[in-house]
């Protein structure tokens, strides 16, 4: 697993509230452009249909669908999921730090977790400024 971490300028409860909303996944997870959660929403065992755009220099862009399986949730501390295509295991951990800040750690079996953390940082920072 490859891991990245960054301190966010928001309390852990606010960051968790953002992460626990299925529709926000496409706002911060690279490559995902839309989410259709099942009726369980943010719960272990839930399956979310996710959309992404595949780009090919010969055939152009096309929308593809895959599935996210929510594995484990420890409220305000961690959650893990598995993306079916491309096969990727993900774990997000939150740690409260001084001054109403949150240390977020993202570990992935494939890809660059720093991209997700940077997008999450930008979104949380924007919300904190509103």
Regions found by a protein language model. Name each.
Residues 3-7, 63-67, 89-91, 105:
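Well-ordered beta-strand positions in beta-sheet-rich domains
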Residues 14-19, 25, 50, 70, ...:
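Hydrophobic pocket/interface hotspot
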Residues 77-130:
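Beta-strand/loop substructures that line and gate deep hydrophobic ligand-binding cavities in soluble
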Residues 23, 27, 56, 125-128:
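Secondary-structure transition/hinge residues
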Residues 36-86, 99, 115:
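Glycine-rich portal/gate segments that line the openings of hydrophobic small-molecule binding cavities
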Residues 7, 71-72, 95-96:
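Well-ordered beta-strand positions
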Residues 1-43:
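Hydrophobic ligand-binding cavity/cleft-lining segments
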């Amino acid at each position: 697993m490859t891991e990245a971490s960054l301190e966010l300028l928001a309390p852990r409860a606010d960051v968790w509230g953002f992460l626990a909303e299925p529709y926000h996944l496409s706002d911060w997870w690279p490559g995902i452009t839309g989410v259709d959660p099942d009726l369980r929403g943010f719960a272990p065992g839930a399956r979310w249909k996710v959309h992404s755009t595949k780009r090919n220099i010969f055939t152009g862009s096309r929308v593809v669908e895959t599935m996210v399986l929510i594995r484990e949730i420890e409220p305000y501390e961690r959650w893990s999921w598995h993306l079916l295509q491309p096969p990727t295991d993900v774990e997000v951990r939150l740690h409260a730090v001084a001054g109403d800040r949150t240390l977020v750690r993202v570990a992935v079996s494939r890809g660059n977790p720093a991209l997700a953390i940077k997008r999450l940082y930008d979104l949380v920072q924007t919300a904190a400024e509103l």
